[in-house]
């Protein structure tokens, strides 16, 4: 996490290595982790993070993304495949009605783990290396978007969009 922050701050020329927050700018320091999370979630939709969970179900059960999240501790954004039991898809693929008892083997794509006070010190990114390489541009663009005195925000945004188009959609 600190390495990414250093890359972003060096890119926008705000790095102060002696400062505990790595920058002397309190606005940037306050926004940094929220912006990192936002860009990370955006990139996870391009570079999908696959996961798997098994859930015991009964005939007639309705399972929503929230139920999968409760079982797996991850925020789901797309179910890829369900095996092991018959089911119907409802609500545009966000609700599943099970037609028999059994174990649903659910393969899904999820968002990365959020940065929190509990995991900040040991946070490890779950995105692929190519996504992590372009992430500083997305974070820098967002941090500088309201800085009208320079054009760096839009320059970084353009570069980020270009690099995003080059991402291989397969994970790692």
Predicted regions and their residues:
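Glycine-enriched, solvent-exposed interface loops adjoining structured elements
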Residues: 1-172
């Amino acid at each position: 996490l600190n390495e990414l922050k250093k890359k972003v701050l060096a890119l926008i020329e705000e790095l102060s290595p002696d400062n505990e927050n790595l920058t002397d700018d309190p606005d940037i320091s306050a926004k940094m982790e929220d912006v990192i999370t936002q860009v990370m979630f955006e990139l996870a939709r391009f570079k999908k993070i696959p996961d798997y969970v098994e859930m015991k179900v009964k005939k007639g059960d309705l399972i929503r993304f929230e139920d999968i999240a409760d079982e797996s501790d991850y925020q789901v954004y797309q179910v890829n495949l369900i095996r092991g039991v018959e089911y119907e898809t409802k609500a545009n693929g966000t609700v599943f009605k099970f037609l028999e008892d059994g174990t649903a083997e659910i393969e899904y794509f999820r968002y990365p783990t959020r940065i929190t006070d509990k995991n900040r010190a040991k946070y490890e990114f779950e995105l692929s290396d190519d996504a992590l390489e372009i992430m500083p541009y997305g974070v820098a663009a967002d941090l500088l978007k309201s800085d009208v005195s320079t054009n760096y925000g839009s320059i970084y945004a353009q570069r980020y969009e270009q690099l995003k188009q080059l991402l291989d959609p397969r994970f790692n």
